[in-house]
Amino acid sequence: MNTTYSSFTSLATLFVAERSEQSPVSYDRDTVITWGDFQQHVATLAQQLETQPTQNIALCFGNSYLFAVGFFACCHAGKSIVLPGNYQPEALKELSEHYDLLLHDADVSVSEQVGSLLVKAQSLVGITLINEPEAKQPYFWRELKLAEIPVTLFTSGSSGTPKAIAKTLKQLDIEVAILDNLWGDTVANTRVESTVSHQHIYGLLFRVLWPLCSARPFSAHNLEFPEQIVHHADADTTLVSSPALLKRLSEEHNPVAIRCVFSSGGPLPNQAAQHSQLLFGSLPIEVFGSTETGGIAYRQQHVASTPWTLFPGVEAELNHENCLKLRSPHIDENTWYQTADECYFHDSISFELRGRTDRIVKVEEKRISLVEVEKRLEQLPWVQESVVIPMEESGRLTLVSIIVLNDKGSDVLNELGKGKFWLELRKALRNWLEPIAIPRKFRVVDEIPLNSQGKRQVAEIEKLFQ
């Protein structure tokens, strides 16, 4: 596949800028979709959507190429875009107040109670729309007015009801331009493989919008297992991934050169960062941000204490609790946004993250930082990773923890047995923590339960103690 291109294009002028109809946009196995195909598919769907009376259209696709078709068809048809973060039928029903029509592909099952339109792909060569003829020619492309195109995303909702976050395509376009200014030369002439969903802001930006604006072809489907990365990636690949997958890479996987690796969605342990560099020859570029804020900062973790650098255009200061306060064009450049991320600034643009102040619980009137308990657990010589959560037990709030042991920890556990090992662990924690802050129950797991965005799955963790 020829992946040599030039120039970067704004989302506003993407469809009116000059580009060869034969340049590849997306691929799936041996099938390559060209720019000419993409234009035709977007035009076909846009014309159908223009006849729909509905305004708010939800997109829910397993196939990233069809998602891109749906996204830009909505833009050109003058529709508002809604991006549910969850494919599950009941979750889609729960969010139905936010949309009038759901556009989806065959990878997503939809309740009959939700108005929907199915988009099919035949080997990714042609796109078929239910009960609709081919696009009427010609279709006149126009420059998009980005500030007038609303895009609603949702927080992950892993421990509560998903929260709607309103953005505009202009805000997303600003982010894409910043990404290209920072790393455009690094990723030039690569193709994009991904392990994260385009339904969330990180995947939307890094695996769909930025590749389209910089004319880099992206895979229509995600890689789900470490073995697939090793098989599909090479020196002409940009990998968009998360700690959830990068932590699963092991010494058993054969090294493969990858041009650039991005990671976002949660903290990447230093051990995983260093192993990724050994395996891929590329130290992951970590991106810190959220659905609400967009990108905040980035770093390459040479050591665990490597500071974060603010993205260009992002202003930051600390409040009285040393929590990050932001102003940026990704949010609202005229107002400050308060986060719960405790930080220490080295200078005006670089800082260290200290944890989240909203992970404070009261146990028998004592304020306990779950972040600190996890930190103390991970300082022990036996523990690689930990998660601490509060749980109700017989009407009383207590702390419980799941831990991933390192090799030394596994050896000590086998030598002492569970009972004596937990006694030793609690004894060691008492050097830092009050008795009430020491978890009452522990479970050893092979890996922390995370979703595809790298967020902890609290419900799955709770099940381990029920």
Feature annotation, model-predicted:
Residues 3-4, 13, 20-51, 167-170:
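Conserved AMP-binding/adenylate-forming core of the ANL superfamily
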Residues 4-6, 13-21, 133-154, 185-192:
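Conserved pre-ATP/AMP-binding loop-to-beta segment of ANL
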Residues 34-35, 141-142, 150-177:
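Conserved AMP-binding A3 loop
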Residues 99-107, 164-182, 187-248, 285:
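AMP-binding/adenylate-forming
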Residues 250-304:
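Gly/Ser/Thr-rich phosphate-binding loop
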Residues 317-375, 379:
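Conserved ATP-binding/catalytic segment of the ANL
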Residues 361, 389, 402, 425-466:
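Conserved C-terminal "lid"/linker of ANL adenylate-forming enzymes
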Residues 380-395, 400-404:
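C-terminal boundary motif of the adenylate-forming
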